[in-house]
């Protein structure tokens, strides 16, 4: 095995708080890796690539932008592809290395925020057969979509939320930070406009995914704190106590039932 980690020499000054926030979530995502629902998501991803003829040629290369702990990169590695992952969070990247080492697959790993500067610094000019990004917040920036396109030799896949409804997170987020004003529709439209401008054979598929998450009160407190806490808010334990007070009245027999409905855009295109 040759699971290397390289920290890219780019300025992280403006990214430190976000990096730490994702680092604090990395343990959760390592534990999520072997859960049945995560395995099903990876299987669905691979099936989509196969059905849409997006898989690299045998032994080909793939880049995962915002790879997290490498769930999807490892899924491709199991199929015999040479995979690379890049993520802002060093905690996530070290989690990816831990999982890759355990499973016996090679994944090249890089720590950096994705940008055109990062792409150029790494010399990734039409380097990978497939470049993809899954639920990576930074990819709502059109310039980062263009950088993704420039890193690909053949095809790209961008998977992103176009609408999110999360009963408990929405309530807690409004309590702590005010009503969510993220312009999902306009952000997705701007990215789609850019993709139609630069790409060929663009295909957009929307999937609506309803789900009810059931967890104990203690696990729910930890989970929603992990989802919401950032350094700008304050002390994590203070948020935990407040979250417990807010969600405990919603518990049914000691469990929290959280209903979510996500609308997800699967956008594929060819670069040539």
Give residue spans per PLM region.
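A short SAM/SAH-binding and catalytic strip from SAM-dependent methyltransferases
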Residues: 128-143
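Conserved Class I S-adenosyl-L-methionine
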Residues: 203-272
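Class I SAM-dependent methyltransferase SAM/SAH-binding core
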Residues: 71-117
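Conserved class I S-adenosyl-L-methionine
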Residues: 1-57, 59-68, 157-182
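Short alpha-helix
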Residues: 184-199
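A short glycine-rich, Lys/Arg-flanked "PGG" loop and its adjoining helix->strand segment in the class I
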Residues: 142-157
């Amino acid at each position: 095995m040759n699971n290397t980690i390289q920290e890219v020499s780019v300025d992280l000054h403006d990214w430190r708080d976000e990096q730490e926030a994702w680092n604090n979530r990395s343990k959760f995502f390592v534990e999520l890796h072997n859960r049945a629902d995560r395995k099903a998501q990876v299987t669905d991803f691979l099936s989509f690539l196969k059905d849409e003829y997006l898989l690299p040629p045998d032994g080909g290369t793939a880049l995962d932008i915002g790879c997290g702990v490498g769930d999807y990169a490892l899924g491709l590695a199991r199929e015999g592809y040479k995979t690379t992952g890049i993520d802002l969070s060093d905690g996530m990247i070290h989690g990816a290395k831990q999982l890759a080492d355990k499973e016996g697959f090679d994944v090249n790993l890089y720590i950096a925020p994705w940008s055109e500067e990062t792409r150029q610094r790494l010399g990734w000019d039409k380097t990978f057969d497939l470049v993809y990004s899954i639920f990576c917040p930074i990819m709502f920036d059109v310039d980062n979509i263009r950088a993704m396109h420039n890193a690909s030799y053949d095809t790209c896949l961008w998977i992103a939320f176009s609408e999110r409804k999360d009963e408990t997170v929405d309530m807690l987020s409004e309590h702590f930070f005010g009503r969510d004003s993220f312009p999902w529709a306009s952000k997705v439209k701007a990215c789609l406009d850019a993709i139609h401008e630069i790409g060929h054979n663009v295909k957009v598929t929307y999937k609506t995914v309803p789900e009810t998450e059931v967890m104990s009160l203690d696990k729910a407190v930890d989970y929603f704190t992990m989802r919401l806490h950032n350094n700008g808010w304050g002390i994590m334990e203070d948020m935990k106590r407040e979250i417990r007070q807010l969600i405990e009245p919603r518990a049914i027999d000691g469990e929290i039932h959280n209903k979510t409905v996500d609308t997800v855009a699967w956008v594929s295109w060819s670069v040539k």
